[in-house]
From Swiss-Prot:
Gene3D superfamilies assigned: 1.20.1270.10, 3.30.420.40, Actin, Chain A, domain 4 (3.90.640.10), Substrate Binding Domain Of DNAk, Chain A, domain 1 (2.60.34.10)
PROSITE patterns: HSP70_1, HSP70_2, HSP70_3
Entry's family note: Belongs to the heat shock protein 70 family.
Protein name: Chaperone protein HscA homolog
Organism: Pseudomonas putida (strain ATCC 47054 / DSM 6125 / CFBP 8728 / NCIMB 11950 / KT2440)
Length: 620
């Protein structure tokens, strides 16, 4: 007779059986899935023993090819073979048009403004293409591990915004994966090295992949990984090295820059092969059609020097943001296949003054770290206790206040998950609604920040301006996704929004936001101070005008009223200009001139309230 398996509600009948979870590195050029096996995190191979899955999908009549077969067909069937789809995740048609010369696809628009790639199977969104890659990785993992997955940790660049992160989660869901967490790629690398080497101190994670670059500064102490600062470039990677070589071939071979898709693809494959060969060789033979030439490592390094310099500039900025000095960085971890380029390792080593760590395969380190985190989140306790992991948000989050100013609620580099609240109030008497405008960025004026969402809080009880208390709460979950709620504390009316990312963001915006915030810090501070003085002046003018309309004839002599109106006109004239100090002084002057009027109004109000009441009634 079979024995019944009895367990507490919610507990597995086999409490010591491991729950199957994986880490997935969904890369621009290559992807990989890893899992903990026999206490060690390792990549999972396919039936042929390959652990790397090229991030390539080819659409044919009635079937798909994913991986190496698709990549091999890219030259012969470029319109139906999608490579580097990660660059399109969460992007809009405007961004695709900027990349049009580099991407040999036919793009069509959709209602969501998401770009669709026209294939023989019909339009395919970047989310669908990524889902096809993730599905192959899921099937590989389940076949290797011998069971159904409870979930996966999927890595994304630290610089991925809401739209790109949400697109990644959508792709996973479409592939039949339960996302335990989205994990920043540099943080995943820190997890891998922290486990294997028990590192402590300040560590820089230099992650140069096929399409994106990330730099993270982390402090590692006793199992705690805290990201101090992040930076990078969403449009910098090994693909750009390939395009540099391809441009050189076009120039040397005397080719037209207006190439058909098949020639473009073949040219990029030739360039990629030359780049990889120059990792070990000083010179490589290059051929394209009837043209033959030689490319030296020195010439290649000269081509990519501006790209390497861009990455180093981002490194310096991240170190500055972290509050540490370059000399305090005790280790530099290299992540991504593009860090195999000798010039990259040399430049990074020179910047930080130490030889970068490369003991874990840079193509595998992210997946290995993600698998460790997935195993923990799946409920499998690790020896030595739990791993505490702290990510940060890359750009400040806030909302619009009067005068078009950006009020930061959650500053950039704040550890997530996080919830922060601030209280705001109404601007006008009797105001019954408030528009909440959610923004992202580092600048002081909303015109220089990115608009994320808008929603309206209605039903605010009628009160004088400034009496209502509206608490606005920003909440960022562990995946870096944002929700915002607003509540009027007196009445309890509330409204909220789950920020639905727009797919219309262009590639350079995030990097430009940070760059502009540094370059315009001084002028932004001046602009904010000016606008604050203008808002204060406008509010005082409105309040004084309301008081004059209500009680001016009753409580003021004609000379007193003329004096107040003269100061009001002086302030109006100054508000049309840009002299913040003068506006501030005139606002104070008008306030002083109206002090006696305000006192009379208060006395009048008190007398009216006490009229007809005796002392006993007042004391009660």
């Amino acid at each position: 007779m079979a024995l019944l398996q009895i367990a507490e509600p919610g507990q597995s009948p086999q409490p010591h059986q491991r729950r199957l979870a994986v880490g997935i590195d969904l890369g621009t050029t290559n992807s990989m899935v890893a899992a903990l096996r026999s206490g060690r995190s390792e990549p999972l191979p396919d039936a042929q023993g390959n652990v790397i899955l090229p991030s390539a999908v080819r659409y044919l009549e009635g079937r798909n090819e994913v991986g190496q077969a698709a990549r091999d067909a890219a030259s012969s069937d470029p319109l139906n073979t999608v490579l580097s789809v990660k660059r399109l995740m969460g992007r809009g048609l405007a961004d695709v048009k900027q990349l049009g010369e580099q991407l040999p696809y036919r793009f069509v628009g959709g209602e969501s403004h998401m770009p669709f790639i026209d294939t023989v199977q019909g339009p395919k969104s970047p989310v669908e293409v990524s889902a096809d890659i993730l599905k192959v990785l899921r099937e590989r993992a389940e076949a290797t591990l011998g069971g159904e997955l409870v979930g996966a940790v999927i890595t994304v660049p630290a610089y991925f915004d809401d739209a790109q992160r949400q697109a990644t989660k959508d792709a996973a869901r479409l592939a039949g994966l339960n996302v335990l967490r989205l994990l920043n790629e540099p943080t995943a690398a820190a997890v891998a090295y922290g486990l294997d080497q028990n590192a402590e101190g300040v560590v820089a994670i230099y992650d140069l992949g096929g399409g994106t670059f990330d730099i993270s500064i982390l402090r590692l102490t006793a199992g705690v990984f805290e990201v101090l600062a992040t930076g990078g470039d969403t449009a910098l990677g090994g693909d750009d090295f390939d395009h540099a070589i391809a441009g050189w071939i076009i120039e040397q071979a005397g080719l037209s820059s207006d190439l058909d898709p098949a020639t473009q693809r073949a040219l990029l494959q030739t360039a990629c092969a030359a780049k990889e060969a120059l990792t070990d060789a000083d010179v490589v033979s290059v051929s394209h059609g009837a043209w033959h030439g030689e490319l030296t490592r020195n010439a290649f390094e000269a081509m990519i020097e501006p790209l390497v310099a861009r990455s180093l500039k981002a490194c310096r900025r991240a170190v500055r943001d972290s509050g540490v000095e370059l000399e305090e960085v005790s280790a530099v971890v290299m992540v991504g296949g593009s860090t195999r380029v000798p010039r990259v390792r040399e430049a990074v080593g020179a910047l930080f003054g130490r030889t970068p760590l490369t003991s874990i395969d840079p193509d595998q380190v992210v997946a290995i770290g993600a698998a460790i985190q997935a195993d923990t989140l799946a409920g499998n306790r690790r020896e030595g206790g739990e791993l505490l992991l702290l990510d940060v948000i890359p750009l400040s989050l806030g909302l619009e206040t009067m005068g078009g100013l950006m009020e930061k609620v959650i500053p950039r580099n704040t550890t997530i998950p996080v919830a922060r609240a601030q209280e705001f109030t109404t601007y006008k008497d009797g105001q019954s609604a408030m528009m909440i405008h959610v923004l992202q960025g580092e600048r002081e004026l909303i015109s220089d920040c990115r608009s994320l969402a808008r929603f309206e809080l209605r039903g605010i009880p009628a009160m004088v301006a400034g009496a209502a208390k509206i608490r606005v709460t920003f909440q960022v979950d562990a995946d870096g996704l944002l929700s915002v709620a607003a509540r009027e504390l007196g009445s309890g009316v509330e409204a909220s929004i789950q920020v639905k990312p727009s797919y219309g963001l262009t590639d350079g915006e995030i990097a430009r936001m940070l760059k502009d915030s540094f370059e315009h810090a001084g002028s932004d501070k001046h602009a904010r101070q000016l606008r604050e003085h203008q808002v204060d002046g406008e509010r005082l003018l409105e309040a004084v005008q309301g008081a004059l309309d209500a009680d001016g004839d009753r409580l003021l002599s004609s000379d007193e009223r003329d004096a107040i109106e003269f100061q009001m006109q002086e302030l109006r004239d100054l508000l049309a200009g840009t002299d913040g100090a003068a506006i501030e002084q005139q606002t104070k002057r008008l306030s002083q001139v109206t002090d006696a009027f305000a006192a009379r109004r208060l006395d009048s109000t008190v007398k009216a309230a006490l009229a007809g009441r005796n002392l006993n009634e007042i004391e009660e």
